[in-house]
């Protein structure tokens, strides 16, 4: 039977523990709330990583926060040239989370890094749904030059009411996502992804005999590989990623409306401070020839590559653009957009387009368009 002295000691011990732990818990909670209040995804992730890593044992913390190995491109090329054979130099990064500043940590988790897991594998693991291309709903899109009679060299001219009677104003929506299907492949720690993008043009303001038809829908599945790399670029830039993939794009229609093409592409991811640049080059592949090809001249208008640019104005405002140009034909396109916060995770977007190829059915038709709509936070893509 415990004595009165033993009971007193137990109570004193509980009191000491409570008085010591409660302030710690309060401080920890306040710090976590400060992280939650951050609107910028990059800075918020860095804040959470820093405070929660501090609660782990030293060995677990170091293991969990160790940065992902990257291919040192400069040393790989230099060593391969010196030895006369292929030499892969993979650089194991140090601590990915500096303990002194969330701002310094945020410099590591850039939008490009988060999009493609260049510095750290995402906790959602394989097969998780991730952002890919911009995902938006534009209730109002105005096109100054509708394509009333779309055509191609092998399919002739399409004469249908949904094209001939279309209005200049319509609704545009795009859904896009990607999922990692394999990670840390080969000695270079590459990742394999599946992506899907679907864009629709809806004649919602056209209340004719065919009430509010979908004028066109493009489907674009793709599979691609990304490789984290490290190399310096002029003017303080950094080469962060190399990649390659295969993409199929079609509108799912029968002749004469059918449009489709397949491409193999190579890409790179580069950063200059708040500016992210992703150039791509492509070639047509596995397409049918002759009269079996829906659009044999599509490369004349869509070119052989594009350049994506994104610039972070501040925590929640971005501008981005996509540029295409074929120097041989002089045809191309420019897309530009501005995203801004509305409330919570909801963003607004203003988007403009000039040139050829706003959709597959319009690949050889020049037009100008502008629209305004909504975009969910984290789904503005790059």
UniProtKB/Swiss-Prot annotation:
<feature type="topological domain" description="Extracellular">
    <location>
        <begin position="251"/>
        <end position="259"/>
    </location>
</feature>
<feature type="topological domain" description="Periplasmic">
    <location>
        <begin position="314"/>
        <end position="315"/>
    </location>
</feature>
<keyword id="KW-0812">Transmembrane</keyword>
<keyword id="KW-0443">Lipid metabolism</keyword>
<dbReference type="GO" id="GO:0008970">
    <property type="term" value="F:phospholipase A1 activity"/>
</dbReference>
<dbReference type="InterPro" id="IPR036541">
    <property type="entry name" value="PLipase_A1_sf"/>
</dbReference>
<keyword id="KW-0732">Signal</keyword>
<feature type="topological domain" description="Periplasmic">
    <location>
        <begin position="378"/>
        <end position="382"/>
    </location>
</feature>
<feature type="active site" description="Nucleophile">
    <location>
        <position position="250"/>
    </location>
</feature>
<feature type="topological domain" description="Periplasmic">
    <location>
        <begin position="273"/>
        <end position="274"/>
    </location>
</feature>
<feature type="transmembrane region" description="Beta stranded">
    <location>
        <begin position="307"/>
        <end position="313"/>
    </location>
</feature>
<dbReference type="GO" id="GO:0004623">
    <property type="term" value="F:phospholipase A2 activity"/>
</dbReference>
<feature type="binding site" description="in dimeric form">
    <location>
        <position position="258"/>
    </location>
    <ligand>
        <name>Ca(2+) 2</name>
    </ligand>
</feature>
<comment type="function">
    <text>Hydrolysis of phosphatidylcholine with phospholipase A2 (EC 3.1.1.4) and phospholipase A1 (EC 3.1.1.32) activities.</text>
</comment>
<keyword id="KW-0479">Metal-binding</keyword>
<feature type="topological domain" description="Extracellular">
    <location>
        <begin position="203"/>
        <end position="213"/>
    </location>
</feature>
<feature type="transmembrane region" description="Beta stranded">
    <location>
        <begin position="347"/>
        <end position="356"/>
    </location>
</feature>
<feature type="transmembrane region" description="Beta stranded">
    <location>
        <begin position="275"/>
        <end position="284"/>
    </location>
</feature>
<dbReference type="InterPro" id="IPR003187">
    <property type="entry name" value="PLipase_A1"/>
</dbReference>
<feature type="topological domain" description="Extracellular">
    <location>
        <begin position="285"/>
        <end position="306"/>
    </location>
</feature>
<feature type="transmembrane region" description="Beta stranded">
    <location>
        <begin position="169"/>
        <end position="183"/>
    </location>
</feature>
<feature type="topological domain" description="Extracellular">
    <location>
        <begin position="326"/>
        <end position="332"/>
    </location>
</feature>
<feature type="topological domain" description="Periplasmic">
    <location>
        <begin position="184"/>
        <end position="189"/>
    </location>
</feature>
<keyword id="KW-0472">Membrane</keyword>
<feature type="transmembrane region" description="Beta stranded">
    <location>
        <begin position="333"/>
        <end position="341"/>
    </location>
</feature>
<keyword id="KW-0998">Cell outer membrane</keyword>
<feature type="transmembrane region" description="Beta stranded">
    <location>
        <begin position="66"/>
        <end position="78"/>
    </location>
</feature>
<keyword id="KW-0106">Calcium</keyword>
<feature type="binding site" description="in monomeric form">
    <location>
        <position position="294"/>
    </location>
    <ligand>
        <name>Ca(2+) 3</name>
    </ligand>
</feature>
<keyword id="KW-1134">Transmembrane beta strand</keyword>
<feature type="transmembrane region" description="Beta stranded">
    <location>
        <begin position="214"/>
        <end position="233"/>
    </location>
</feature>
<feature type="topological domain" description="Extracellular">
    <location>
        <begin position="79"/>
        <end position="168"/>
    </location>
</feature>
<comment type="subunit">
    <text>Homodimer; dimerization is reversible, and the dimeric form is the active one.</text>
</comment>
<feature type="transmembrane region" description="Beta stranded">
    <location>
        <begin position="190"/>
        <end position="202"/>
    </location>
</feature>
<feature type="active site" description="Proton acceptor">
    <location>
        <position position="248"/>
    </location>
</feature>
<feature type="transmembrane region" description="Beta stranded">
    <location>
        <begin position="366"/>
        <end position="377"/>
    </location>
</feature>
<dbReference type="GO" id="GO:0009279">
    <property type="term" value="C:cell outer membrane"/>
</dbReference>
<feature type="transmembrane region" description="Beta stranded">
    <location>
        <begin position="316"/>
        <end position="325"/>
    </location>
</feature>
<feature type="topological domain" description="Periplasmic">
    <location>
        <begin position="234"/>
        <end position="236"/>
    </location>
</feature>
<dbReference type="GO" id="GO:0046872">
    <property type="term" value="F:metal ion binding"/>
</dbReference>
<protein>
    <recommendedName>
        <fullName>Putative phospholipase A1</fullName>
        <ecNumber>3.1.1.32</ecNumber>
        <ecNumber>3.1.1.4</ecNumber>
    </recommendedName>
</protein>
<feature type="topological domain" description="Periplasmic">
    <location>
        <begin position="28"/>
        <end position="65"/>
    </location>
</feature>
